[in-house]
């Protein structure tokens, strides 16, 4: 449990360094692009999964 606390503490320190620095604006722009990209991919794969369903596989 202490190991996980230490790992998350280090991640928080790194996130704070990025957040208090000037990188946050650029990272937010990239995050928005990635969000919409993965949202579109999710919808496409969801539709493919729903339309591609068939009966159970043969035994």
Curated annotation (Swiss-Prot):
Keywords: Cell membrane, Membrane, Transmembrane, Transmembrane helix. The keyword Cell membrane applies. The keyword Metal-binding does not apply. InterPro entries: DUF1328 (IPR009760). GO terms for cellular component: plasma membrane. The chain crosses the membrane at residues 5-25, 30-50. It is found in: Cell membrane. It is a multi-pass membrane protein. NCBIfam families: PRK13682.1-1, PRK13682.1-4, PRK13682.2-4. Belongs to the UPF0391 family. HAMAP family: UPF0391. This is UPF0391 membrane protein LPC_1949. It comes from Legionella pneumophila (strain Corby). The lineage of its organism: Bacteria, Pseudomonadati, Pseudomonadota, Gammaproteobacteria, Legionellales.
């Amino acid at each position: 449990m202490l190991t996980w606390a230490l790992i998350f503490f280090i991640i928080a320190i790194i996130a704070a360094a990025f957040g208090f620095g000037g990188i946050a604006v650029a990272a937010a722009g990239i995050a928005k692009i990635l969000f919409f990209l993965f949202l579109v991919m999710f919808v496409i794969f969801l539709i493919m999964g729903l339309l591609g369903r068939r009966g159970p596989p043969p035994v």
